Amino acid sequence: MKRVVITVVELALTVVASAKVENGGIDAKMMEQLRKGYTASPEQKAVKNALASTPINTLATNGENLAMCDTHFSHRVKTSGITNQKSSGRCWLFTGLNVLRAKMINKHNLGTMEFSQNYCSFYDLLEKSNLFLQAIIDTHNLPLEDRKVDWLLHNPIGDGGQFTGVSNLVMKYGIVPKEVMPETYQSNNTRQMRTILSLKLREYALALRATDKKLLATKKVEMLTEIYRILVECLGVPPTEFEWTLRDRSGKALSTERYTPKSFYEKFIGEDLEGNYIMVMNDPTREYGKVYEIEYDRHVYDGENWLYINLPIERIKEMAIASIKDNTAMYFSCDVGKYLNRDKGTLDLANFDYESLFRTSFPMSKRERVQTFASGSSHAMTLIAVDLTAEGAPRKWMVENSWGAQSGYKGNLIITDEWFNEYMFRLVVERKYVPEDILKMLNQKPIMLPAWDPMFAPEE
């Protein structure tokens, strides 16, 4: 067992952090004051009684905003069909594949089709397992209490992610149609599988930390062999070759050929996802015009961390509008749980009036919400439409979601421009829609941020 050495500074900080302040607790006098502060007026009794048996959002629903929203959009990307991630955290994968799906449908005049999310999920979990194990090897000499090691052990594997995962996986492994590797129960319901994998990876982490350095590489392969077996049993064997028939919208067969996953991607998409797409973000806690890189912000160890250009929201809107006008969908992420009316399928600051219900205010700005972990990117969807005024200003936006066709507005969510300002965080846009002055920002040396930065939780 390694001897733990505590420095004088660390000890002093521990003492300060644990020191109790006199009168810092809730004593009888304070409790009496709190009780007196609550006056059971008829209004307060009514609210208390209602909250005892009714969801908060039901009571906070803004009655003046109940009318169905306008579903007209001046510009909309042509899409077909709605996907469903079910009980999994794979929104990032569904969204990225939906961006590619729209391209294939429009390019080849196809009906509804999907790429296999399960195929990509298999390699995503295998690559994340390798990323974790190799990171444990790379931090072999650090103490278990080190912040980086601590973060790794808290986050061994999950099925959340972002566009980096799509670009890494598709460029390395290709894609296949959904019918070639369909979903399984475990791919649709990932919680228990994630628990099993996490438990195994944490066990392996301790074993690797106790292994001689000369044996680490061999040991890792043995561990990944076991992980591979578990993934096969949960998700199936990924195909290395398959036969597929291309059909038009009417169902007429156009061609039947044999493909590998990579040759299929090259024939029907063929883009360099790692070089042709730019990720921009709106993070008001950081300086605009700077490029940021997040440690371990990738799904593949031998891939590259994604780079984010931090921009004012209006610059991001310019690129989004240009892309939609050119019939090109985008990867979009936001804090979807805020002011979401699931029945109407709207994201609108006027959906709920929490202030009136609780007779208080919630004045924090977007910057303050991010700083205090009150908000951040939580879900990815496909940005497909914008409604512009005669002057070209956006009124509202629409995203294609991955919660099934019965969710929201025909499987989509309609976003007011005011909500977009407050809760939109990231957009992945093709390079050709990015102004030259923004592209030049990529020449900067990126500012490296730690993996636990509050802005960069995986989208689920």
Per-range role (PLM):
Residues 117-246:
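Papain-like cysteine protease catalytic cores
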Residues 93, 119-122, 168, 177-180, ...:
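Structural recognition of the beta-strand scaffold that forms the well-ordered cores
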Residues 21-22, 215-460:
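Active-site signature of cysteine proteases
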Residues 69-139:
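Post-signal peptide N-terminal segment of secreted/secretory-pathway proteins
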Residues 1-22:
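Bacterial Sec-dependent N-terminal signal peptides
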Residues 77-89, 151-157, 302-310, 319-320, ...:
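Second-shell loop/turn segments in exported
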Residues 21-81:
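N-terminal regions that are enriched for targeting/export leaders
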